């Protein structure tokens, strides 16, 4: 069994939880006489420690710095695109290849059904997203979620297929960036991303984009032009990672915390700037603490947003989408 991943700022909480678990195990072991004052005292200690754990948990996760949110977004136990697809949707049929060079495993996509029987909603959609691995072997297979040009061309092929059959498009964004290798550049990485931006702006079907983890630069926006941009509470979205920003400005990665603050890359920051439309609330501690709850929350929001977008005609969708992205950004003079 893989060891539990504990981030540096989570260590005080982890240590308390470990102590609490040890006390619970000791209480159940039967080594404490059920009629003794010692057992009653131990129960009181456990209750007191439980309260301390809950209080510390809220204190930590309600006051995260921008860099700590970046760390949470990269947590290896966080749900990825395929996890969300299987938790939120039915009848997923993966489609492969860009019909030009190959099949990039860092981006997956296909038709699936998003439905809520209690709400009487059922809609076939095209779902596309970055996919990371869970261990060394699967990360190599998925190229650590860094897509090649053929990945973005595959994504565009699937979007055009969805447009042909008049199906909404949902993209799930989670990448440390587009793959920067020489081969990727030779095959037209920049052109593939630019083409996606151009074509996505004009898709005649509803498009919803969700940043579920990392949203780094062109690798993210290559599947990130939509009518509605949603973002998980502890995700990040920026033109550059804090480490890369730090290495450029300070010639060292040691200033990544300051870089994260300057980049204003969190969901709260981007909502205030008008870059995203809505924040998807995560379970306390991050999406990986309760993936099912996170998927249920996201599913409800997707259905709500789709219901509104499906009432709009193609011309309105395209006009509003272009106006939305054209209006982003500000110019400030010092």
Swiss-Prot record:
Record domain CoA carboxyltransferase C-terminal: where: 48-308
PROSITE patterns: COA_CT_CTER
Cell location: Cytoplasm
Annotated catalysed reactions: N(6)-carboxybiotinyl-L-lysyl-[protein] + acetyl-CoA = N(6)-biotinyl-L-lysyl-[protein] + malonyl-CoA
Any one Gene Ontology molecular-function term assigned to this protein's record: ATP binding
One GO CC annotation: acetyl-CoA carboxylase complex
UniProtKB keywords: ATP-binding, Cytoplasm, Fatty acid biosynthesis, Fatty acid metabolism, Lipid biosynthesis, Lipid metabolism, Nucleotide-binding, Transferase
Entry keyword annotation includes Disulfide bond: no
One example of a Gene Ontology biological process annotation: malonyl-CoA biosynthetic process
Pfam family, one: ACCA
EC number: 2.1.3.15
Metabolic or biological pathway, per its Swiss-Prot or TrEMBL entry: Lipid metabolism; malonyl-CoA biosynthesis; malonyl-CoA from acetyl-CoA: step 1/1
Stated role: Component of the acetyl coenzyme A carboxylase (ACC) complex. First, biotin carboxylase catalyzes the carboxylation of biotin on its carrier protein (BCCP) and then the CO(2) group is transferred by the carboxyltransferase to acetyl-CoA to form malonyl-CoA.
Complex and partners: Acetyl-CoA carboxylase is a heterohexamer composed of biotin carboxyl carrier protein (AccB), biotin carboxylase (AccC) and two subunits each of ACCase subunit alpha (AccA) and ACCase subunit beta (AccD).
Family: Belongs to the AccA family.
Name of the featured protein: Acetyl-coenzyme A carboxylase carboxyl transferase subunit alpha
Lineage: Bacteria, Pseudomonadati, Chlorobiota, Chlorobiia, Chlorobiales
Gene name of this polypeptide: accA
């Amino acid at each position: 069994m893989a060891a539990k991943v504990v981030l540096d700022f989570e260590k005080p909480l982890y240590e308390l939880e470990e102590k609490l678990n040890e006390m619970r195990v000791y209480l159940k072991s039967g080594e404490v006489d059920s009629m003794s004052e010692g057992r009653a005292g131990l129960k009181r200690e456990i209750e007191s420690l439980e309260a301390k754990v809950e209080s510390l948990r809220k204190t930590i996760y309600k006051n995260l710095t921008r860099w700590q949110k970046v760390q949470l977004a990269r947590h290896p136990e966080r749900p990825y695109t395929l996890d969300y697809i299987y938790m939120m949707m039915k009848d997923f049929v993966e489609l492969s290849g860009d019909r030009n060079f190959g099949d990039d495993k860092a981006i997956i996509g296909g038709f699936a059904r998003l439905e809520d029987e209690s709400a009487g909603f059922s809609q076939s959609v095209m779902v596309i997203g970055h996919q990371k691995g869970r261990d060394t072997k699967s990360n190599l297979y998925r190229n650590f979620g860094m897509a090649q040009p053929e990945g973005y061309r595959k994504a565009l092929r699937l979007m055009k297929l969805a447009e042909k059959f008049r199906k909404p498009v949902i993209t799930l964004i989670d990448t440390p960036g587009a793959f920067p290798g020489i081969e990727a550049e030779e095959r037209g990485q920049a052109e593939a991303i630019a083409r996606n931006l151009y074509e996505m702006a004009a898709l005649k079907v509803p498009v919803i984009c969700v940043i579920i983890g990392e949203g780094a630069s062109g690798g993210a926006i290559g599947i990130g032009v939509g009518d509605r941009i949603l973002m998980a509470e502890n995700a990040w979205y920026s033109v550059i990672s804090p480490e890369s920003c730090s290495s450029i400005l300070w010639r060292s990665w040691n200033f990544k915390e300051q870089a994260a603050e300057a980049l204003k890359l969190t969901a709260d920051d981007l909502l205030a700037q008008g870059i995203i439309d809505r924040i998807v609330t995560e379970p306390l501690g991050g999406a990986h603490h309760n993936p099912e709850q996170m998927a249920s929350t996201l599913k409800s929001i997707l259905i709500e947003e789709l219901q509104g977008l499906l009432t709009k005609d193609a011309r309105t969708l395209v006009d509003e989408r272009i106006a939305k992205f054209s209006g982003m950004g500000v110019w400030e003079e010092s």
